[in-house]
Design a protein with these regions (language model features):
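Beta-lactam-recognizing serine transpeptidase/beta-lactamase-like catalytic domain environment
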Residues: 1-171
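Ligand-recognition elements built from short beta-strands and adjacent flexible loops
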Residues: 130, 172-277
Length: 277
């Protein structure tokens, strides 16, 4: 069995229990059990996250270290400070290296496991076809009247992309969601997926078909990329958009506008509207 000393050592190495040092006021330390007062019950509950308190930025800092090869860095909000009139950089901020906490080989194993969570497990609602995403869902009872609520939850998902060489990490937490099944994979993972879709364009992340293939169920709705048909004649556009529901209007034979635009994602067999001119 994992002993409390080793568990708490790794928890603290990951940055929990102390402020991250982010350039943001009001940061908290979080709450951990005192090692001297930690019994078998506290050891067990700490292992799955009950009885302790951590901040969202601590979560991001820790997971970033786990997936970047094992190095813990101080997070920051502002990369460069600019002179407003000339846009000259007057101060730059670089992440402080706090040390290596795990081996690269361990980091690679965890990344693969977390990619599997999205492709085959509880994080499947964050999956994007032809892109590699790793992540972990969370479903935590909220504290109420000195104990844990049986009906109120914090639903979360923390994920990263690409799973094999991360460029972005996303943490989503939703407290006391209404009218939905109370699971992080149901509520938070789809929100993270939408953020990843935007990040693909912003960061110019290329498709990668070498990842773990998704296990689809009848509940899944597959998303596909809309081809860019602007400038094509209508007959050619129809061939390219085969499999989509096409609606078009206007006078002429050439596509002058397309919605959704080429490169966007829609549900399989979704509708594409064309304007002709």
């Amino acid at each position: 069995m994992l002993q409390k000393e080793k568990l708490m050592s790794y928890i603290k190495k990951l940055g929990f229990g102390t402020k991250t040092g982010i350039d943001l006021n009001g940061e908290g330390n979080g709450i951990l059990f005192n090692l001297d007062k930690m019994g078998n019950v506290e050891l067990a509950t700490t292992a799955f996250g009950q009885g302790i308190s951590v901040t969202p930025i601590q979560q991001v800092q820790a997971v970033s270290a786990i997936i970047n090869g094992g190095t813990l860095y101080t997070p920051f909000l502002v990369k460069n400070y600019l002179e407003p009139e000339t846009n000259t950089i007057i101060k730059s901020v670089n992440a402080q290296n706090k040390g290596t906490i795990i081996k690269k080989e361990t980091s690679d194993l965890v990344k693969y496991a977390l990619e599997s969570v999205v492709a085959k497990g509880s994080g499947h609602n964050a999956y994007i076809e032809n892109y590699r995403i790793g992540g972990k869902t969370g479903t935590a009872q909220t504290v109420e009247n000195g104990g844990y609520s049986s009906s109120k939850y914090i639903l979360s998902f923390i994920g990263f992309m690409p799973a094999n060489d991360p460029e972005i990490i996303v943490y989503v937490a939703v407290e006391n969601a209404k009218g939905v099944v109370q699971y992080g994979g149901t509520v938070a993972a789809p929100i993270a997926r939408n953020i990843f879709l935007s990040a693909i364009d912003i960061l110019d992340i290329k498709p990668d078909t070498e990842g773990i293939p998704k296990e689809y169920t009848w509940l899944d709705q597959k998303y596909v990329v809309v081809p860019d048909v602007v400038g094509m004649n209508i007959d050619e556009a129809k061939k390219v958009l085969k499999g989509f529901n096409i609606e078009y209007s206007g006078n002429g034979e050439t596509v002058i506008y397309e919605s959704p635009k080429g490169g966007m994602y829609v549900k399989e067999k979704g509708t594409v509207v064309l304007m002709l001119g």
